[in-house]
A protein has these predicted regions:
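Membrane-interface helix-loop-helix junctions at boundaries between adjacent transmembrane segments
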Residues: 1-45
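C-terminal ends of transmembrane helices
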Residues: 1-7, 53-68, 113-125, 176-182
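Cytoplasmic-side transmembrane-helix entry/capping segments in multi-pass membrane proteins
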Residues: 8-17, 67-77, 126-134
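Hydrophobic alpha-helical transmembrane segments in multi-pass integral membrane proteins
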Residues: 24-35, 81-95, 139-154
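Structural signature of hydrophobic alpha-helical transmembrane segments
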Residues: 36-51, 97-108, 164-167
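Membrane-helix boundary elements
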Residues: 62-66, 73-98, 118-119
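Hydrophobic membrane-spanning alpha-helices of multi-pass integral membrane proteins
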Residues: 76-84, 106-111, 133-144
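Short, highly charged, low-complexity non-transmembrane loops/tails of multi-pass membrane proteins
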Residues: 186-195
Length: 195
């Protein structure tokens, strides 16, 4: 399990193959009613989140800032708690229990970090890293929709429609900026990418 990699080279993108993979597999298993497999895969994703999350937070707190082009990948820090929240709702029948509230609490913390990062995100050149917002924020919207249903919130249908409209507009903006960047030749980094 030894990896020849400097701490400064780590970034939140490493959550995707392990944490997201395990949690999404748990959600899929839960959808098919495979309880034991969903629990196993949830454990896999959760433990990977704890281990990698510790490494990544250490990197973000103690090492030089990520290159400007990679700043948007910090948005992935919001993904584990909201994806885990979505999966937990699928596993427990949509109840807002203790685990759901713990995941929501951490999701709120990471969402507040995202709000504080807006000025930094605005300085980053638009490129592929911005597509992490698509997965992360749609997972967050889905988690909010699960919460609205679990809490039987007033106006939940209207709030859901607003959230879905905002998500759709976000995807449209990403797609539009991507196409413009591709046409201008500014979307992809120059090869070879600078370290």
């Amino acid at each position: 399990m030894r990896v020849e990699m400097r701490l400064v080279d780590w970034n939140p993108g490493y959550f995707l193959p392990t944490v997201a993979g395990g949690l999404l597999a748990a959600g899929g298993a839960a959808a098919f009613g495979w309880v034991r497999l969903s629990e196993l895969m949830f454990g896999f994703g959760f433990i990977c989140w704890v281990v990698l999350g510790s490494i990544l937070l250490l990197r973000l707190f103690t090492q030089p800032a990520l290159p400007n082009r990679l700043l948007p990948v910090i948005a992935i820090e919001l993904a584990p708690p909201v994806v885990a929240g979505n999966v937990w709702f699928a596993m427990n029948g949509g109840r807002a229990d203790f685990v759901a509230r713990v995941l929501a609490g951490y999701a709120l913390l990471m969402a507040s970090v995202q709000l504080s990062m807006i000025p930094s995100y605005r300085t980053a050149p638009f490129g592929p890293a911005f597509w992490v917002f698509a997965f992360t924020y749609v997972a967050a919207v889905t988690d909010v929709i699960f919460w609205l249903k679990a809490e039987d919130a007033d106006y939940s249908k209207a709030i859901t429609y607003v959230l879905l409209a905002l998500s759709t507009l976000g995807y449209a903006a990403l797609a539009t900026r991507t196409v413009k960047g591709m046409i201008r030749g500014t979307f992809l980094p120059e090869y070879p990418a600078a370290r």
